[in-house]
Amino acid sequence: MHQVISATTNPAKIQAILQAFEEIFGEGSCHITPVAVESGVPEQPFGSEETRAGARNRVGNARRLHPQADFWVAIEAGIDDDATFSWVVIDNGVQRGEARSATLPLPAVILDRVRQGEALGPVMSHYTGIDEIGRKEGAIGVFTAGKLTRSSVYYQAVILALSPFHNAVYR
């Protein structure tokens, strides 16, 4: 059984990690241990590079806390131009997989507040009345009318980031 350290305690992210690992390695193939670690970037990262740096930092910090694990996984959400997206970073001590999620365009009224320094989650909670929306369906669930959720979009990115770990051509 793979010991997987999730560099987050966010249920939406943990669900995506668990589902993706079980899809690739088989049901019951892993045990997820969530840990709260620092990203080293602002609460609301801007741009692809800052967001990816946050995910990489989280993986490194999780690895220092639990060096005996098989995998360390981080999902860092950010804002790039007028959209939200995330970077997924997965490390197994030998190689790393990274993938960027799909992007969701955000309305100007939301972006204005985020650009003024507020994090997307609290802004979305304010507009929707859904407490801790970032730990649930997220802006993705709201603006896709539930057709996608934060977790379902992250799931795809985790699957992509896992590609180097089960395909021999990457080695």
UniProtKB/Swiss-Prot annotation:
Binding site for Mg(2+): 38, 68
Organism: Salmonella newport (strain SL254)
Cofactor(s) for this UniProt protein: Mg(2+); Mn(2+)
Name the record gives this protein: Inosine/xanthosine triphosphatase
Family matches, as NCBIfam families: inosine/xanthosine triphosphatase, PRK05074.1
EC number: 3.6.1.73
One Pfam family in the UniProt entry: NTPase_I-T
Binding positions for substrate per the UniProt entry: 8-13
Catalyses which reaction(s): XTP + H2O = XDP + phosphate + H(+); ITP + H2O = IDP + phosphate + H(+)
Similarity annotation: Belongs to the YjjX NTPase family.
Function: Phosphatase that hydrolyzes non-canonical purine nucleotides such as XTP and ITP to their respective diphosphate derivatives. Probably excludes non-canonical purines from DNA/RNA precursor pool, thus preventing their incorporation into DNA/RNA and avoiding chromosomal lesions.
